[in-house]
Curated annotation (Swiss-Prot):
Plays an essential role in the virus replication cycle by acting as a viroporin. Creates a pore in the host endoplasmic reticulum and as a consequence releases Ca(2+) in the cytoplasm of infected cell. In turn, high levels of cytoplasmic calcium trigger membrane trafficking and transport of viral ER-associated proteins to viroplasms, sites of viral genome replication and immature particle assembly. The secreted form acts as an enterotoxin that causes phospholipase C-dependent elevation of the intracellular calcium concentration in host intestinal mucosa cells. Increased concentration of intracellular calcium disrupts the cytoskeleton and the tight junctions, raising the paracellular permeability. Potentiates chloride ion secretion through a calcium ion-dependent signaling pathway, inducing age-dependent diarrhea. Belongs to the rotavirus NSP4 family. This is Non-structural glycoprotein 4. Glycans are attached at N8, N18. It comes from Rotavirus A (isolate RVA/Cat/Japan/FRV64/1989/G3P5B[3]). One of its GO terms (cellular component) is extracellular region. Gene3D superfamilies: 1.20.5.430. Its main location: host cell. InterPro entries: Rotavirus_NSP4 (IPR002107). GO terms for molecular function: channel activity; metal ion binding; toxin activity. The chain crosses the membrane at residues 29-51. It is found in: Host rough endoplasmic reticulum membrane; Host membrane, Host caveola; Secreted. The N-glycosyl content is primarily Man(9)GlcNAc, with a small amount of Man(8)GlcNAc.
Length: 175
């Protein structure tokens, strides 16, 4: 355990790896050497970091399968990011969470559409009732005998109530 946390040990292993790579590939024109060295360094670091982390996680956690799965997925996602990929590996739990979120949002939108549709139907019914109230009846049904000015055509005896409605009245106000 002391060697895992010892920085000098880790640095000496990295130096040893670099020296070994330099001796294997003595060609100074090797264009891929920095990439190979960085990949090996990342793999070594992941090896040194992941094993103790998994051991501690397994000892402290009660659901070891989920922790191991999460660690492995995290390691692969890190490797994919280092390789330049934008895609990531997701677990079934994350997919189920995303699906639940999508289904919940769809239900919310369906409820909103249902409310809006109900309101629109109510508005259409209200407009229909208003239209029915405002619709004009045909000319054949309207009694137009009282519509024209009867002052010139009827005499006092012919008025329906007995007096001319167009005759001005005298109004006296009390003081």
């Amino acid at each position: 355990m002391e060697k895992l946390t010892d920085l000098n040990y880790t640095l000496s292993v990295i130096t040893l790896m670099n020296d070994t790579l330099h001796t294997i590939m003595e060609d100074p024109g090797m264009a891929y050497f920095p990439y190979i060295a960085s990949v090996l360094t990342v793999l070594f670091t992941l090896h040194k970091a992941s094993l103790p982390t998994m051991k501690i996680a397994l000892k402290t956690s009660r659901c070891s399968y989920k922790v191991i799965k999460y660690c492995i997925v995290s390691i692969f996602n890190t490797l994919l990011k280092l390789a330049g990929y934008k895609e990531q590996i997701t677990t079934k739990d994350e997919i189920e969470k995303q699906m639940d979120r999508v289904v919940k949002e769809m239900r919310r939108q369906l409820e909103m559409i249902d409310k809006l549709t109900t309101r629109e139907i109510e508005q259409v019914e209200l407009l229909k009732r208003i239209y029915d109230m405002l619709i004009a009846t045909s000319v054949d049904k309207i009694d137009t005998t009282q519509e024209f000015n009867q002052k010139h055509f009827k005499t006092l005896n012919e008025w329906a109530e007995g007096e001319n409605p167009y005759k001005p009245r005298e109004v006296t106000a009390s003081l």
